[in-house]
Amino acid sequence: MGLGLVDCHCHLSASDFDNDLDDVLEKARKANVMALVAVAEHAGEFERIMQLSERYNGFVLPCLGVHPVQELSPEKPRSVTLKDLDVALPIIEKYKDRLLAIGEVGLDFTPRYAGTDEEKEEQRQVLIRQVQLAKRLNVPLNVHSRSAGRPTISLLREQGAEQVLLHAFDGRPSVAMEGVRAGYYFSIPPSIVRSGQKQKLVKQLPLSSICLETDSPALGPEKLTRNEPCNISIAAEFIAQVKGISVEEVREVTTRNAFRLFPKLQSLLQKELQSHPLQAKSAQGSAGESKGLL
């Protein structure tokens, strides 16, 4: 078995995991997951994510950011405001040295969330400020772009963002290729098994631009069923099927891509990398060895 998989985008602070997170993470370890990139959506989650990163040190890796849709109550999701960002920034500054990336950030032009030009423009301003923050901290961006693929990629390029992961991209492959040309990565969730759009996307994306994610508890292989990080192998297997290559190649290359995207991840696991270079055709490590370092 290879060095291990990296779940590049998941929501471990979600209430769905309140009662059994230990079990969920143990299942992930047994599924050869070596690292979980935990993203935030609003300031109210930040402390919880940092606590999880301490409790599962070297396994749960924290990202803090302000999402374009603020679901502070399930009944009233709304478009983000600059005030939301102002609340979040001091907490991000507090933890800046411990962050793997800034995220989840981005644009969401779904009409029910951003029905006016003013709301879309405020989303852009919130994203621009977080791009500037990520550049100052020299960390990547973990990006949401629902119903806003082209505007998101255009803004990121205009702002000079270089380290970017576009998670669960829902746009056309031709638009995604603009991101590929900018050096951006695209993470693919297990829901690819039921998404013709994701399958077309993967068919066109070069493997060198693909990472794996689960977006747990969302975007699982079955609709309306809680997704978990252990399902990441489902995404890897389906990508292999779509591209007509071995699942071993998908696992190896997507993990290597994750290390390129997240430099701090490479630093964290430097000893493992020295023992089992990701560039090698066949990694010699085992799941047990990976766990021992985490």
Curated annotation (Swiss-Prot):
Instruction: Give the similarity note.
Output: Belongs to the metallo-dependent hydrolases superfamily. TatD-type hydrolase family.
Q: Does the keyword Transmembrane helix apply?
A: no
Compartment(s): Nucleus
Where does this protein chiefly localize? nucleus
Q: Which domain of life is it from?
A: Eukaryota
Q: Which InterPro entries match?
A: Metal_Hydrolase, TatD-like
Is Nucleus among the key words of this record?
Answer: yes
Residues annotated as binding Zn(2+) 1 are H9, H11, E104, D215
**Can you name the source organism?**
Mus musculus (Mouse)
One example GO MF annotation:
metal ion binding
Top EC class of this enzyme:
hydrolase
Q: Name one GO cellular component term.
A: mitochondrion
Q: Which UniProt keywords apply?
A: Hydrolase, Metal-binding, Nuclease, Nucleus, Zinc
Identify this protein by name: Putative deoxyribonuclease TATDN3
Provide the E.C. number(s) assigned to this enzyme.
3.1.21.-
Gene3D superfamilies xrefs:
Metal-dependent hydrolases
- Classification via SUPFAM superfamilies: Metallo-dependent hydrolases (SSF51556)
Instruction: Describe cofactor binding as the record notes it.
Output: Binds 2 Zn(2+) per subunit. Exhibits AP endonuclease and 3'-exonuclease activities in the presence of Mg(2+) and Mn(2+). In contrast, in the presence of Ca(2+), shows AP endonuclease activity exclusively.
Q: Where does Zn(2+) 2 bind?
A: E104, H144, H167
Q: What does this protein do?
A: Exhibits 3'-exonuclease activities and apurinic/apyrimidinic (AP) endonuclease (in vitro). Show preferential AP endonuclease activity on double-stranded DNA substrates and 3'- exonuclease activity on single-stranded DNA.
